[in-house]
């Protein structure tokens, strides 16, 4: 009796290639996410530095302005 090859091995190879591509895409996403995180961290640090500078120069005026705008 003759046996027939269903080509299942080839499908396994294709699935493996798909998994490799998926992992590579996830790696790119992680890299993009890391870059965004670093950029946002830099922006936040810059903003905090600017606030510190304003407070060092005229903290009393800053507080008066805050209270006048409804702050407590």
From Swiss-Prot:
- The secretion signal range is none
Q: Does the keyword Coiled coil apply?
A: yes
The UniProt record lists the Isoglutamyl lysine isopeptide (Glu-Lys) (interchain with K-? in acceptor proteins) crosslink at: 72
Q: Where is this region: Disordered?
A: 1-41
What Pfam families would the database entry show?
Pup
Q: What is known of its domains?
A: The N-terminal unstructured half of Pup provides a signal required to initiate unfolding and degradation by the proteasome but is not needed for pupylation, while the C-terminal helical half of Pup interacts with ARC to target proteins to the proteasome.
Q: What is this protein called?
A: Prokaryotic ubiquitin-like protein Pup
Name the species this protein comes from.
Answer: Frankia alni (strain DSM 45986 / CECT 9034 / ACN14a)
């Amino acid at each position: 009796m003759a046996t027939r090859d269903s080509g299942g091995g080839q499908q396994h190879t294709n699935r493996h290639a798909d998994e490799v591509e998926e992992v590579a895409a996830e790696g790119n996403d992680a890299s993009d996410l890391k870059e965004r995180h670093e950029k946002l961290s830099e922006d936040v640090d810059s903003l905090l530095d600017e606030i510190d500078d304003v407070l060092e120069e005229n903290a009393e005026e800053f507080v008066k302005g805050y209270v006048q705008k409804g702050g407590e």
